[in-house]
């Protein structure tokens, strides 16, 4: 199971002083000693393309965002009007005005057929691109990147911001690849005044100079142990593991990546002074610092009740502000061509509005969004019928989305991963 970095700790600073310098300092990665050795042994040159994946847990309504049906009966079209977008002839709903304004900066997939309407299995299927199979836990995208490219800097190759993933069936996890490729989960509010990352932030009173002194003391103890222990290879490997932990804790790029307060106020304001907005800003900073795959998660999208009020008042405004700004910011910094931005969700919502002013799970249609990394912007792919219930043109599946993601990340089309027992697993089944 993935070990969250904000799980049980020994004091209010986050971790015990003694535990801070133990090999367990990498526990936030879900690593054991042998796990680490496997991960470093498999490290390969990094691809030049990184990825930021937005995951909205619960199933975001396509009707009320990017696939409005203004001519449908009121029981289908809902409460929101359709507005024009930057794409000639394209329309979104009025509660995503910023997306509409910048629709020429991303590609919208309206022809997605999720073929599933259940939570949990959705997290596994959509975030891996492989149909749910109870016998095989297919890895999520970031875990595959970790598996094939490994550590390329002091920071982990795969980081997840916020903890809105249903892991009952292995969704969002490394699955068959082993715990060492699970995401490094940061479930701390990036918008908080005291934002810090546990397990890589020294407890109060422990300076980095003090860390170095402790490291030198431990090195002397280790030297004595070596004289009495003939397992030199194991000790050397342990040194490498320990050094990786120390590098992550003490490396300047680690502190710089998470120092979100160093951003100009105007930049932070542009993303939005809310948890989701600052998480997107932090994702950009992590990519700049060498993290190859960042997943930003958000919850509360299972709108069986009060769908319209929830979307308008709380759920959509932060995303409507932050995601277009993320794309713009990456572009202005020259990072968009080397960074794929993807927005995925469980599935769509029912065309017909229920008695609780909500929409239920819908397994036949939904949406996805992509930008950057050479994705043709300003295009709408696929279409749905008059009520948004079924794909009427250019149908795409989660397997096809996975193929596109892996293609942009430079993965081979015949991508095979081997589990801990050596069993091969094919990871790509769709078309780009």
Mark where each language-model region is:
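Ligand-binding pockets and gating/stacking loops
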Residues: 1-432
């Amino acid at each position: 199971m993935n070990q969250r970095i904000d799980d049980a700790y020994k004091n209010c600073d986050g971790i015990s002083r003694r535990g801070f310098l133990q090999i367990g300092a990498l526990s936030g990665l879900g690593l054991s000693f042998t796990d680490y050795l496997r991960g470093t042994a498999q490290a390969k040159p990094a691809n030049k393309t990184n990825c930021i994946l937005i995951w909205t847990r619960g199933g975001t309504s396509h009707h009320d965002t990017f696939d409005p049906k203004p001519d449908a009966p009121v029981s289908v079209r809902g409460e929101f009007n359709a507005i024009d977008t930057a794409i000639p002839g394209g329309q979104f709903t009025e509660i995503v005005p910023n997306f509409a304004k910048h629709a020429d900066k991303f590609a919208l997939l309206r022809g997605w057929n999720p073929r599933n309407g259940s939570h949990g299995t959705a997290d596994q299927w959509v975030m891996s691109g492989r149909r749910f199979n109870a016998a095989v836990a297919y890895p999520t995208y970031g875990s595959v990147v970790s598996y094939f490219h490994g550590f390329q800097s002091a920071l982990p190759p795969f980081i997840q911001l916020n903890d809105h993933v249903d892991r009952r069936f292995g969704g969002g996890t490394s699955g068959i690849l082993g715990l060492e490729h699970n995401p490094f989960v940061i479930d701390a509010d990036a918008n908080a005044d005291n934002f810090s990352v546990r397990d890589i932030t020294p407890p109060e009173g422990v300076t980095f100079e003090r860390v170095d002194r402790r490291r030198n003391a431990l090195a002397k103890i280790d030297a004595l142990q070596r004289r009495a222990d003939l397992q030199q290879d194991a000790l050397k490997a342990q040194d490498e593991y320990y050094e990786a932990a120390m590098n992550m804790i003490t490396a300047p790029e680690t502190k710089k990546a998470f120092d979100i307060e160093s951003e100009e106020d105007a930049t932070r304001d542009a993303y939005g002074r809310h948890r989701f907005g600052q998480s997107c800003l932090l994702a950009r900073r992590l990519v700049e610092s060498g993290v190859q795959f960042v997943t930003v998660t958000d919850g509360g999208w299972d709108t069986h009740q009060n769908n319209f009020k929830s979307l308008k008042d709380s759920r959509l405004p932060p995303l409507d502000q932050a995601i277009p700004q993320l794309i713009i910011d990456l572009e202005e910094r020259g990072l968009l061509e080397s960074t794929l931005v993807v927005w995925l969700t469980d599935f769509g919502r029912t065309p017909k509005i229920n008695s609780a002013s909500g929409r239920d799970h819908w397994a036949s249609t939904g949406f996805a969004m992509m930008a950057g990394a050479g994705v043709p912007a300003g295009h709408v792919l696929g279409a749905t019928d008059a009520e948004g219930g079924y794909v009427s043109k250019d149908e795409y599946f989660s397997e096809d989305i996975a193929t596109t993601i892996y293609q942009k990340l430079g993965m081979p089309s015949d991508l095979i991963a081997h589990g801990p027992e050596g069993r091969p697993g094919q990871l790509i089944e769709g078309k780009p």
